[in-house]
Amino acid sequence: MSNELISAVVQAGIVGAGGAGFPTHVKLNAKADTVIINGAECEPLLRVDQQLMALKAEKMLTALDWIVEHVGAQRGVVALKSHYHNAVDALNAALPNHPKLAVHEMGAFYPAGDEQVIVCEVTGRVVPEGGIPIQVGVVVTNVETVLNLYDAVTAQTPVTQKYVTLTGAVHTPKTVLVPLGITVREALELAGGPTVDKYSIINGGPMMGRLVSPDSYITKTTKGLIVLPEGHSLLNSLNKPLDRIMRDAAIACMQCSLCIEVCPRANLGHRLAPHKLMRMAAYGSLCDEKDTPMNAYLCCGCRLCEYACVMNLQPWKLNGNLKGILGKNGIRNNLKNAPEAPHPFRELKRYPVHKLIHQLDLDVYDVPAPLDETPYVAKKVTLPLRQHVGAPAQPCVELGDTVEEGALVACIPEKALSANIHASISGTVTEVTGDYIVIQA
């Protein structure tokens, strides 16, 4: 099965379906003792994984068995929140057929789905600073990714569609299955469109998602689209300029350190102290010789620091800026400490999701988004060549070519970290550039 599995994953163009889009065939080229399916879906409002686990538990566990065998693991674990009752029941009902697998239930806290947090929750191990789970013998993958793997192995089905939650200020919140490459605007129409005239759209969750144009495209990593009305507090936060953040840090930061109390990286034992980086940025203070701008590399961008701050400051955005400056100057992260254990009070510092939803002013949008798998027939798709971490895929079709849905249209460049891309509809190739391929039905 091992060679067959990797070959199927490569051919199908499978990447991480919920995060940065790391090519799965590379991630699975490893040896580990534990494989974790991350079913936490910790971002508020997103409803994809919890429904897929409830409806496709047996397929997912079968694929997890294959991955466990491939990496030589002793066990596989599905980690999810205990209040996903339908998913928990479905998984437990299927477990007797899978003796190497288990379910790990977690509380409703944020960010339970951060891969370093979930490794600690399931195994008690701490991933080193700037590290990845395989360094402690763990492979972490995503619910939809594993289901894509099942389809690739059993039916040679490539990744051409994506499950996406459509929510926020839309007429009918729902979770849909849509072809890759349709526009965000087109996808939102499946939920009845926005309920307001002036709005912004977040691609991803409200905490770690990014603002996108209605004319941007659905890709392999799109998990949710959240519509928010103009003037919403979350949009104001995302749009706050860096110069104002720096000014506010100098004026308002009182070094209370509430940000470090909730920081998931600090609570894993990593040397990240958001309040000290705020002090450094605001005053150029290096009074603690152990702190350098390099500490910003340890920030995962979860944004909890902002919502713990009584002054509404944004250490996460400052950290992101520092990382950008360091990267542009060729300065790499040299912080690689490996804590033996997390903070002793880590479990007491978990941040409740219901509290976070209220702080985000999203209570009115915290509603079900039932899964609707009705096929959507698109007339045109634009397939970005970089839907994953690494090098963009290389077009292997030409202008005027006729392609069938599922046909390979962009290939992995030789010896590159990349992923194949396939036609999500049948039609004619009407445009090929270095950035995307357009197919018209």
Label each residue range with its predicted role.
Residues 37-49, 170:
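Gly-rich Lys/Arg/Thr-decorated short loops/hinges at beta-loop-alpha junctions or inter-strand turns
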Residues 54-70:
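Histidine-anchored nucleotide/phosphate-binding helix
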Residues 74-184, 190-197, 205-206:
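Hydrophobic alpha-helical positions that pack around
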Residues 125-128, 142, 332-375, 437-438:
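Extended boundary segments
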Residues 228-250, 258-260, 265-342, 378:
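Ferredoxin-type iron-sulfur electron-transfer modules in oxidoreductases and energy-metabolism complexes
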Residues 233-237, 411-423:
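Short, Lys/Arg- and Gly-enriched loop/turn segments at beta-strand edges
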Residues 261, 398-411:
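Short, well-structured beta-strand-loop connectors
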Residues 350-355, 364, 369, 387-391, ...:
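Generic structural motif
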